[in-house]
Design a protein with these regions (language model features):
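Glycine-rich, highly charged phosphate/nucleotide-binding loops
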Residues: 43-56
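Residue-level signal for inorganic ion chemistry
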Residues: 14, 26, 63, 113, ...
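Nucleotide phosphate-binding/pyrophosphate-handling subdomain across enzymes
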Residues: 2-10, 21-29, 279-387, 402
């Protein structure tokens, strides 16, 4: 039992994976758990209006809320009005941590990652580096495994924690050993209400950081979030850059990843962490490692170094890292055209990074879905030179169509609407093949699924969307499917 929870009534709002885990951990600690979920038949309460009208919060001591509940949700608004504290599952995890075996009574430290894009890849790289160093280090959080289950496992040495802005919003006391914000670009504005609110929630990850705040030297907003954070005395800021690093940064010298943030002689020397060849398994169809992948590797390296990992283990971990599905994966080739699945590119920032990996006028772009209030002018303006043609899918085709008309009027655009005989993705891939066939002989062409939008309008998840793309490519008679496509990961 835990005196903080024993006999207390805790409302767990949302019975997804993290909500169920929270309910289990709370019950194990003696709490009286009440559940709410308007889509789960087993929930104690499903109608928020009826629950609140019946004064359902009267006996509630704490709300543990799913990341799916926005701040303006009636349940959270009512809890604020009554003064009932609300936590995320991540906050609960921090509160219930247990001492790790062999840790001298200390709980496992957390290495935390957030950002608009690249979180899952970076946390996966970090996990691989930590395991190469002999640490028992699960990747947890938004990547799939609830943080709260790892927090109560004494067999864990260190946690590689992926956190979304949703999770951070109701996280109040977490004190990570090191934390990183990879980038900040407009996303989930329907949930947060504004870019400023979204960025502020991302920045919460740096609060109370103990050793190092890792930021993107090419993204001034991430550096600003470090400056605004209240950290533990002695914590340092470490930037990552694709250029030659200054003191206090990790970066790239020719094809070598180097450290000038933690190395003992960093004022005069850089310590080698690995080379781009150690990331060869992440190369795109042209054989080059995409810039955003290198940034992710540098961020993961910085977090691992903050934990005390040796540079040789950074190299070994990056070499061993196996990328997840739906992240710039070549799923087949038809008539010399590569078909690449980057269904995980669920916003404009991610799609821009994906398109940047390809050459001029070489991409037939399959895009569209649920826009979440986003605009696409900046994306199209920045990447129009990559486009040979565009196939639009999804319910929110209009914002992309209009941006293309304004900034890339010469690029042919085909729209595929739902409700016809064949599945949307089958027709999209067929149209993309026709556009690709118009390229001059000898010109390399890639059909790229990088939707810049969420998937839930027409697919169960970004993974289901990517699977549908791969299936449609196979139906064309693709002559090879990438062995990297090893199954879907958790939703972002």
């Amino acid at each position: 039992m835990d005196a903080r929870f024993d006999g207390r009534t805790v409302l767990v709002a949302g019975l997804g994976v993290s909500g169920r885990a929270a309910a289990q951990v709370l019950a194990d600690r003696g709490a009286h758990v009440v559940t709410f979920d308007d889509r789960a038949p087993e929930a104690d309460h499903r109608d928020v209006a009826a629950f609140l009208a019946g004064d359902g919060l009267a006996e509630v001591d704490l709300v543990v809320a799913s990341p799916g509940l926005p701040p303006h949700h009636p349940l959270l608004a009512a809890a604020r009005e009554r003064g009932v504290p609300a936590w995320s599952e991540v906050e609960l995890a921090w509160q219930v941590r247990v001492p790790r075996d062999g840790g001298g009574g200390e709980a496992a430290p957390w290495l935390a990652v957030t950002g608009t894009n690249g979180k899952t890849t970076t946390v996966g790289m970090l996990e691989s580096i930590l395991r190469a160093a002999g640490r028992r280090a699960p990747a947890v959080g938004n990547v799939g495994t609830p943080v709260v289950l790892a927090a109560v496992d004494p067999q864990v040495d260190v946690l590689a924690v992926e956190l979304s802005s949703f999770q951070l919003h109701l996280t109040h006391s977490m004190s990570p050993q090191a934390a990183a914000v990879l980038n900040v670009a407009p996303d989930h504005l329907d949930w947060h209400g504004s870019l400023e609110a979204y960025a502020a929630d991302k920045g919460r990850i740096f609060e109370r950081t103990q050793v190092a705040c890792v930021y993107n030297a090419a993204d001034p907003l991430t550096a600003e979030l470090v400056r605004e954070a209240d950290v533990v005395d002695g914590a340092v800021a470490v930037g990552f850059t694709l250029g030659t690093p200054a003191v206090g940064q990790v970066g790239l010298v020719d094809d070598v990843l180097v450290d000038r943030g933690f190395a003992r002689l960093r004022h005069t020397h850089a310590a080698e962490l690995g080379t781009l060849a150690d990331l060869a398994q992440l190369a795109g169809p042209d054989g080059a490692v995409p810039p955003h992948v290198v940034r992710n590797a540098l961020a993961a390296a910085a977090l691992a170094l903050a934990h005390g990992v040796d540079p040789v283990h950074v190299r070994d971990g990056l070499r061993a890292f196996a990328p997840g599905a739906h992240r710039i994966v070549t799923v087949g080739r038809v008539d010399g055209v590569a078909y690449v699945d980057d269904s995980k590119a669920t916003n404009a920032h991610a799609a821009a990074a994906s398109l940047a990996a390809f050459g001029e006028a070489s991409v037939v772009w399959v895009a569209g879905g649920l826009a979440k209030g986003a605009t696409f002018d900046e994306l199209v303006r920045a990447r129009r030179d990559r486009l040979r043609g565009v196939v639009l899918i999804g319910v929110d085709r209009a914002p992309l169509r209009d941006a293309l008309a304004r900034h890339a009027p010469d690029v042919p655009v085909i729209e595929v609407a739902a409700g016809e005989t064949e599945p949307v993705m089958t027709r999209a891939v067929q149209e993309a093949r026709r556009l690709a066939a118009g390229a001059p002989a000898g010109v390399p062409v890639t059909v790229l699924l990088a939707p810049a939008s969420a998937s839930m309008d027409q697919f169960a998840s970004y993974a289901a969307r990517g699977d549908a793309f791969a299936a449609a490519v196979r139906a064309l008679g693709a002559d090879g499917v990438s062995p990297r496509d090893d199954g879907p990961e958790a939703t972002p």
